[in-house]
């Protein structure tokens, strides 16, 4: 339906939005039917331009700092009004959507976009409900005005763009940004703030379920394998990035997937490959002269993306929900080549490694990052998206693991035999074999060896995996150099963890520096 007076298109279909995007010059059609859009200089998130309005209802519950930057309520009101005035005579696209597949824990949201392709992205990534807001909850509003230019002196922003969350008014403002991922991560941050108060753990993870109803979760930063490993032809996908874990089950916060495309291949990632078709948005993907996507081309960015609805995946859990997880996998991309490909964690070790969030920025999703791969500690495997203090989420994780009896594993999808540049990265088939062993229950109660410096228990055998790979020292030609790198990594863990106020049992569960 279109409002002729103001040219506002309400709940437009996929076909309509693709047509609008092409007619308005917002993108091009690829040979496989997807819509390619380019985001310009900002081809990733802009963490330096993300703010939360500092107001009485939420102020005491937010961990303020460089991740959660404060914004004054009056400045927000002024900027929101200026953006609304700017959009008043523009053609707009509006949809009523939901975030959260659980019937109790969803949030209704009205998404207004200046671009047709941004609306297509929102309708792909959020949930299109059969009946909007069936519990009549207060509705959130997202306004996305990519062509609006912020003025720091006038608007109180840090640059010409801003992402601002206002919990009191249930508003999200995106101005001056074309990168569509900001929309999904904004509402993820909203749910990350709201869900803990309802006893639900929000998680930066993917999830899938087997034929017997067994759920597995995969935590990890972008590029560590969440989407790839959860898109398993033998299992049913719940979701690839954002979930809630409530007493009794897990649910997808989204209704679609936002898969990295760099070096995508039909052989290694058939589920993702097949999902890219008409209705999919390809972000910053380069095409050849015949409009065939070249997934190896990173000339625009390493952070190329495909945004598609879950309906594009044949093997999926149709209600976007699953039982509580038997297996929880922490995906770490270790650039030092020190960590084993799989470790079996105790509850205390799970809390330690969840708070640490050790991994690497691989093809980083943040603007200004170089193509160099850097190690990082990202609390809860998603520090940029969690407004509350880290301990809130760690306590909820411990509670869920203890009450259900989930087993947690640390899986290294990074390097072995040496650090990045000297060693080699674990290939996808090896990691898939490890994940197969985890989900089958093969690694429960198996014989292990203990790696003293890393303080990790490692299985002595895994079906389909070369046993020499399991203990990382075996893959290094220079054993003394391995010991040196292992000690350096242990020291980095200890230094990073010093900031947390936790029990001795959790503190002593980490590596031994």
UniProtKB/Swiss-Prot annotation:
Domain of life: Bacteria
Record flagged with keyword S-adenosyl-L-methionine: no
One GO location term (cellular component): cytosol
Protein's cellular compartments: Cytoplasm
InterPro entries: PEP_carboxykinase_ATP, PEP_carboxykinase_C, PEP_carboxykinase_N, PEPCK_ATP_CS
Annotated binding of substrate, by residue: 45, 179, 185, 305
Binding positions (Mn(2+)): 185, 204, 241
Pfam families documented for this protein: PEPCK_ATP
GO MF term list: ATP binding; metal ion binding; phosphoenolpyruvate carboxykinase (ATP) activity
Reactions listed under catalytic activity: oxaloacetate + ATP = phosphoenolpyruvate + ADP + CO2
Cofactors required: Mn(2+)
Record bears the keyword Transport: no
Alphabetical GO biological process terms: gluconeogenesis
Residues reported to bind ATP: 185, 204, 220-228, 269, 305, 431
Biochemical pathway: Carbohydrate biosynthesis; gluconeogenesis
SUPFAM superfamilies tied to this protein: PEP carboxykinase N-terminal domain, PEP carboxykinase-like
Note on cofactor: Binds 1 Mn(2+) ion per subunit.
EC number per UniProt: 4.1.1.49
Alphabetical keyword list: ATP-binding, Cytoplasm, Decarboxylase, Gluconeogenesis, Lyase, Manganese, Metal-binding, Nucleotide-binding
Main function: Involved in the gluconeogenesis. Catalyzes the conversion of oxaloacetate (OAA) to phosphoenolpyruvate (PEP) through direct phosphoryl transfer between the nucleoside triphosphate and OAA.
PANTHER family: PHOSPHOENOLPYRUVATE CARBOXYKINASE (ATP), PHOSPHOENOLPYRUVATE CARBOXYKINASE ATP
Family to which the UniProt record says this protein belongs: Belongs to the phosphoenolpyruvate carboxykinase (ATP) family.
NCBIfam families: pckA, PRK09344.1-2, PRK09344.1-3, PRK09344.1-5
Protein name: Phosphoenolpyruvate carboxykinase (ATP)
């Amino acid at each position: 339906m279109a409002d002729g007076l103001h040219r506002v298109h309400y709940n437009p279909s996929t076909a309509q939005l693709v047509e609008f995007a092409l007619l308005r010059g917002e993108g091009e059609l690829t040979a496989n039917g997807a819509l390619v859009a380019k985001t310009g200089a900002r081809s990733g998130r802009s963490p330096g331009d993300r703010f939360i309005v500092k107001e009485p209802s939420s102020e005491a519950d937010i961990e303020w700092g460089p991740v959660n930057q404060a914004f004054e309520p009056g400045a927000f009101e002024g900027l929101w009004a200026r953006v609304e005035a700017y959009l008043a005579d523009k053609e707009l696209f509006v949809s009523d959507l939901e975030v959260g597949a659980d019937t109790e824990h969803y949030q209704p949201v009205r998404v207004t976009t200046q671009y047709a392709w941004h609306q297509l992205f929102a309708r792909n990534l959020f949930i299109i409900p059969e009946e909007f807001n069936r519990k009549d909850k207060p509705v959130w509003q997202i306004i996305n005005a990519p062509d609006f230019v912020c003025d720091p002196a006038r608007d109180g922003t840090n640059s010409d763009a801003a992402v601002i969350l206002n919990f009191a008014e249930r508003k999200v403002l995106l101005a001056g940004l074309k990168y569509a991922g900001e929309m999904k991560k904004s509402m993820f941050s909203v749910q990350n703030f709201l869900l803990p108060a309802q006893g639900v753990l929000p998680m930066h993870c993917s999830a899938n379920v087997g034929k017997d109803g067994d759920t597995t979760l995969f935590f990890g930063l972008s590029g560590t394998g969440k989407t790839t490993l959860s898109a398993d032809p033998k299992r049913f996908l719940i979701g690839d990035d954002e979930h809630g874990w409530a007493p009794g089950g897990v649910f997808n916060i989204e209704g679609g997937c936002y898969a990295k495309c760099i070096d995508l291949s039909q052989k290694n990632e058939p589920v993702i490959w097949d999902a890219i078709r008409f209705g999919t948005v390809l972000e910053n993907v380069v095409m050849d002269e015949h409009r065939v996507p070249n997934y190896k081309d990173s000339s625009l960015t390493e952070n190329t993306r495909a945004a598609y609805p879950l309906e594009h995946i044949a093997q999926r859990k149709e209600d976007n929900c699953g039982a509580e997880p038997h297996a929880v996998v922490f995906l770490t991309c270790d650039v030092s080549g020190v960590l084993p490909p799989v470790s079996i964690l105790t509850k205390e070790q799970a809390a330690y490694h969840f708070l640490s969030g050790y991994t690497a920025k691989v093809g980083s999703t943040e603007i200004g990052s170089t193509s160099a791969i850097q190690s990082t500690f990202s609390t809860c495997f998603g520090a940029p998206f969690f407004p509350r203090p880290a301990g809130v989420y760690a306590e909820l994780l411990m509670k869920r693991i203890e009450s259900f009896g989930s087993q947690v594993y640390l899986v290294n999808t990074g390097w072995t035999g040496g650090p990045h540049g000297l060693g080699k990265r674990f290939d996808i088939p090896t990691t898939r074999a490890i994940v197969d062993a985890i989900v089958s229950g093969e690694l429960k109660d198996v014989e292990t060896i203990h790696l003293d410096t890393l303080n990790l228990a490692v299985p002595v055998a895994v079906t389909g995996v070369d046993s020499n790979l399991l203990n990382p020292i075996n893959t290094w030609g220079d054993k003394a150099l391995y010991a040196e790198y292992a000690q350096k990594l242990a020291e980095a863990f200890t230094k990073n963890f010093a900031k947390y106020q936790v029990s001795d049992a959790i503190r002593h569960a980490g590596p031994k520096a």
